[in-house]
């Protein structure tokens, strides 16, 4: 099967001839913006035979709304207005994706772009400490700000698919750590903006991936995101202690992506070729279905990983 046919069939629980594979990582300083960033993506995806491309939003983590830089008390958030579709923050990300898409040797390679949920955008644009303090001071004010940011993140998703040729977004939700807030608080104040963006993205593509991020190493309340309307779910299996089969059941039988520890202590980064391939064969053998499973990592791989290691995974998958 061609890569596009393979990935889309797997997402739709249709028969496939092998398990799809996708890995990605952040790029170093000097390759986070502009043409160097585009070229870094092309150097990877045109030379490593993975089945899908996830384009990074490196350089665009911070939400550059002027008001966000001057907020002092929680009630200040009520004055927040969207950046709008013509703001460079949005326009430049769309242009990045189009440039990568146009430069791929395989024009059929499925392409996804990393979009953060509003609760991540607001914290990157200010600080985690400030937002959490304001959430305690006036949670409705923060929820209002998240709704405004959701307008920008939603139009970004729309333009990525209508103008840049994205097949879907890789939608990253964060902030659900068990030690941060309760499920009830998250669902009341954070979930509405999370879902607003994802639901808008779903209007333009049915192939959106939900990434339940565990980058900090702290377990999340996965219940926060259990009912989110995404086609594919990815979570930090090694942080959450929830393997692929259990996770697929937890998320209602949706297609799942992952299975590999992204950390430097994991076998993918530190194991021998024999160890890596043994792990991958065991992972595939553990799946309880011939479709609906995609091999990837808990999160981004370390930027200094030897790309030959991804080739080892691909070799094991193709020979399985």
Regions found by a protein language model. Give the residues of each.
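Alpha/beta catalytic barrel-like cores
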Residues: 24-27, 49-83
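Active-site loop segments of alpha/beta catalytic cores
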Residues: 1-35, 40, 51, 55, ...
